[in-house]
Structures are given as structure tokens and as C-alpha cells.
A protein has these predicted regions:
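Active-site loop/oxyanion-hole signature of alpha/beta-hydrolase fold enzymes
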Residues: 6, 23-77, 92-93, 238-243
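Conserved hydrolase catalytic core segment
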Residues: 73-111
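Short beta-strand/loop motif that positions the catalytic acidic residue
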Residues: 189, 195-197, 201
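Catalytic histidine-centered segment of alpha/beta-hydrolase-like enzymes
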Residues: 227-240
Length: 252
């Protein structure tokens, strides 16, 4: 069996991140899977001539990239905004989704409070720049007990964040603010869904996720204490094992 015929797992990063966030996470993955990572539009090295940052445009880009790699179906493992992209992808290309991991992500749209917060963040970026924004944005995404313990990882994310173009930061914030409710995608899902949830997540609360667990036909969940919005660093071994076990279910 050649590597290209192995079951495909596609990892999608979040806002202000890049494909590099998955490097450590995927290093000890078992053989027998084809692991793919992408830079979403405007992120990492994928920064040239981007005009549309919407979740739908990102989903079309993902579909195009999978087709170029001759991937007909994949398990999507998606952090935060990557999950919003994956839900838009699953809405349009359900036949290409073997399974879905919502890694600190949600099918709900922004609340009014969250939308107002996006506007404040955009205003801050326009006035003070991306570098200043990332200095204050990333730290609270870790659970309080992990903020100093995982200093190296925090600085790694801040470096990626600072390198993200201002147009991307503004475009992605606007796109996330305007994304629709996609709970119907979960309700109609013919594929299994794994929710990975941090109990200390300030971006996606446990309370908002619990009702979503009941929506898919087959739902799995990992709820983690002392974890914020960055479980792939905060509980790397546990979350990696959860994804490996889930891949076994999806492709078993």
C-alpha cells in the first residue's frame, strides 16, 4: 500500500496560526495514515493575492487542495477557526468528509457580545498593529495554570501571529463575525464527530458545546480540565491519543 492510498487526515489550523502548529502534534502519529496540513488563505506562507477570507472561500480552497492531492475523503481535524472552515466544507462537500474533529470549535455563530468583541479587536489592530494585538490576544487562550508553564509554546504562537498580515487578521475577524449558524451541518452529519473541549476555554465555552454533542448521529467528546483553547499544546498526549483513537473508529 503506498502512502498516497492510506486514509487521509487533514489538519486545519486556527485564526492567526499556520500549519506549523501541527508539527509536534503529528510527529508521533502511527503509520498507516496520510497526514496533510495546509496554510489557510492569508496564513503562513499562503498570503499572496487573497481577496476573500470567508469560511466559504476557505472551504473551496480546502476542496481544491484535496483534489490536487487526489484525496476523495478525509478525516478533518480542525482547531478553532479551522473548525468553522470545516463546517462550511462539510455543508458544501459532505461526501468528502469521513469524520470531523472540532478541536475547541463550534457550529454556533458569534453571539452579539462576541461580534462586538470582534469589532473591538479590529479597531485595536487598525490603531496599534498586529504585533501589539498578538501580545495580548494569545496569552488568555491558555488556561491560567499553563500560561507560564508553556512559555515556549506561547512565544511560538505569538511569533506565528505577529507574522500574519494585517489584511488577514482584519479579514478573518470580519469573516468569523459574519459566519452563519451551522448546527444543521452537525444535525445532518452522516460522519462521526469528535468534540475536544477545554473547560477553561475563554473562546468556546463548555456550556455552549454541550447541547451540540446531541446533534450528530454519532458523537464523541473529550472534556478536559485545566485546558483552555490550545489543547494540542496544553494536553498534547491526551488529545493526540483521542484523535488517533477516533481515526481508528472513522476508518476502522
Amino acid at each position: 500500500m503506498t502512502a498516497s492510498s492510506f486514509p487521509a487526515i487533514l489538519f486545519l489550523h486556527g485564526f492567526g496560526e499556520s500549519r506549523e502548529v501541527w508539527t509536534e502534534f503529528t510527529r508521533d502519529f502511527p503509520d498507516g495514515y496520510r497526514l496533510l496540513t495546509l496554510n489557510l488563505l492569508g496564513h503562513g506562507t499562503n498570503v499572496h493575492d487573497i481577496r476573500d477570507y470567508s469560511m466559504e472561500a476557505q472551504a473551496r480552497y480546502v476542496a481544491e487542495q484535496l483534489r490536487q492531492r487526489n484525496v476523495e475523503r478525509a478525516l478533518l481535524v480542525c482547531h478553532s477557526m479551522g473548525g468553522y472552515v470545516a463546517l462550511a466544507f462539510a455543508e458544501r462537500y459532505p461526501e468528502m468528509v469521513a469524520g470531523l474533529v472540532l478541536f475547541h470549535s463550534t457550529a454556533l455563530p458569534d453571539s452579539d457580545e462576541k461580534r462586538a468583541n470582534r469589532d473591538k479587536n479590529m479597531d485595536f489592530v487598525r490603531r496599534h498593529g498586529v504585533e501589539k494585538f498578538m501580545e495580548s490576544f494569545i496569552r488568555p487562550l491558555f488556561a491560567p495554570s499553563n500560561r507560564e508553564r508553556l512559555l515556549e509554546q506561547r512565544e511560538f504562537l505569538e511569533d506565528i501571529g505577529r507574522a500574519t498580515p494585517q489584511a488577514t487578521v482584519l479579514g478573518a475577524l470580519e469573516a468569523m463575525k459574519n459566519r452563519p449558524d451551522r448546527t444543521e451541518v452537525l444535525r445532518r452529519a452522516k460522519f462521526p464527530v469528535l468534540f475536544i473541549v477545554g473547560k477553561e476555554d475563554v473562546a468556546v465555552s463548555v456550556e455552549s458545546i454541550l447541547p451540540q454533542l446531541a446533534l450528530p448521529a454519532q458523537s464523541h467528546a473529550l472534556l478536559l480540565s485545566d485546558v483552555g483553547h490550545l489543547g494540542y499544546f496544553e494536553e498534547a498526549d491526551l488529545t493526540r491519543q483521542a484523535v488517533v483513537d477516533f481515526a481508528g473508529i472513522v476508518f476502522g
